[in-house]
Amino acid sequence: MDIVHSHAVKNEQEGLGNLAGDPNQYFYPGDRHEHPAWDSLCFDYGKDEVMHFLLSNCKYWLSEYHFDGFRFDGVTSMLYYSHGLGEAFCNYGDYFNGHEDDNAICYLTLANCLIHEVNKHAITIAEEVSGMPGLAAKFADGGYGFDYRMAM
């Protein structure tokens, strides 16, 4: 299943854009609130309620509908504060320069651990353009836990 945890619709009527009257309840405030290329909102993975919401979403699809895996959409956008826009990614310094979103990396790692705990045969695929080292390495080996990386 294609799962989109990289961003959310800005709509306030049928989306999370202004849930309970707070436009930042699930999303980053300020300059990081909106994705500059997608006209959508960016989840704040450092908030407990966001982490619980997204992780429970993964578990729901696995438990209730018996999906056997996920292709995570827009992973590059999650990994970097710049969303990977305009970045070259030619050497390790481009990946690990303090511009990576540690909260998003934590979420992706926890999501992979959860998915593989609920269904040890589940497959996770990261749609990702930067080639982030360790993305498709097992958590036990120091990676983020994805089974595959889909280069775009």
Feature-to-residue mapping (PLM):
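Substrate-binding/active-site clefts of carbohydrate-active enzymes
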Residues: 1-100
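Active-site-proximal helices and loops of the catalytic beta/alpha 8
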Residues: 26-29, 34-42, 75-152
